[in-house]
Amino acid sequence: MSMPMDVSKKSFKPAKTQKSKTISNDYIKGLQTKHFLLYNVIPTIGTITAIALLWWYPISSVEIGLLIGMWALSMIGMSVGLHRYFAHRAFKTSQTMSVILAILGCMGAQGPVVSWVAVHRRHHEYSDLPGDPHSPNPELLGEGIFGTLRGLWHAHVGWLTNHEYPNPMYYAPELMRDKTISKINRNYVVWIVLGLLIPTILGGIIHGSWIGAVEGLLWGGFVRMFVVDNSILSINSFSHAFGTHPFDSKDQSRNNIWVAIPTFGESWQNNHHTFENSAAIGLKWWQIDLGYCLIWGLEKLGLVWDVKLPTAKMIEAKKLA
């Protein structure tokens, strides 16, 4: 059943014995650069290649289906899994469902479960202040149009190779102790490869050719990764710079309708930063929130429970005059 959420409660309990909130050394910086090249640059090249090949190999319903299907699976993993479940504990579920959500989240290739959660929890702790890994706040990077552009660039992509790594022992201690999640974490690359193999194999089987397999890899693999990646990154940049700010969230988060569908409803950032533990990010009937639609359906099926939602009184109390 759904339950009122405690808006004052943090999403996690920091480890009392762990003093350092961040880790910064040459090894970590090297990993950040490698991750960026492998899972941001290569999908971008793959997307350009897929578009260039349209002249010789027009896209078919198969490629469109693989793109949409793999995008949906990745976004379920990232929006419902990594974000609302693992980072904010907006609902409870079984170990089997948590494993499925974790693997699907890893297919999005934005970091292992523990790393993703640690970065996100630090973002909420320092939202749009010094210490936020990916704020576009121009006050942190300079005023004027150039400061704004630098802020947007930093929040969207610049931070990926240049941020202090949040210490998982501080920000995600319960996940570090979870043996199942730790095993999924260690096999992060396996899940990314699986996310590439599925559309490759399906494309080859459906088309009955190697060309079909390559098309499946390009559209269901690399283009899908590019779309998912930039959709999520747009939340960091555009949804903390443009849009409405109806609630007193103590930061610069904005509600942005333009990327609501591709982000599964994650773009209602002012709502989210005001009620961070809520399973629903879209709080009005017209605020599209595919992630919560799925959670609602899973709750009806008994697959998730204790779904946290703000009451009407809580929402009214946080509205700006």
UniProtKB/Swiss-Prot annotation:
InterPro entries membership: Acyl-CoA_DS, FA_desaturase_dom
Compartment(s) of residence: Membrane
Main location: membrane
GO biological process, one term: fatty acid metabolic process
Transmembrane segments: 36-56, 62-82, 99-119, 188-208
Reaction catalysis annotation: 5-hexenoyl-[ACP] + 2 reduced [2Fe-2S]-[ferredoxin] + O2 + 2 H(+) = 5-hexynoyl-[ACP] + 2 oxidized [2Fe-2S]-[ferredoxin] + 2 H2O; hexanoyl-[ACP] + 2 reduced [2Fe-2S]-[ferredoxin] + O2 + 2 H(+) = 5-hexenoyl-[ACP] + 2 oxidized [2Fe-2S]-[ferredoxin] + 2 H2O
This protein's domain notes: The histidine box domains are involved in binding the catalytic metal ions.
Family classification: Belongs to the fatty acid desaturase type 2 family.
Record's protein name: Hex-5-enoyl-[acyl-carrier protein] acetylenase
Originating species: Moorena producens (strain JHB)
Taxonomic lineage: Bacteria, Bacillati, Cyanobacteriota, Cyanophyceae, Oscillatoriophycideae
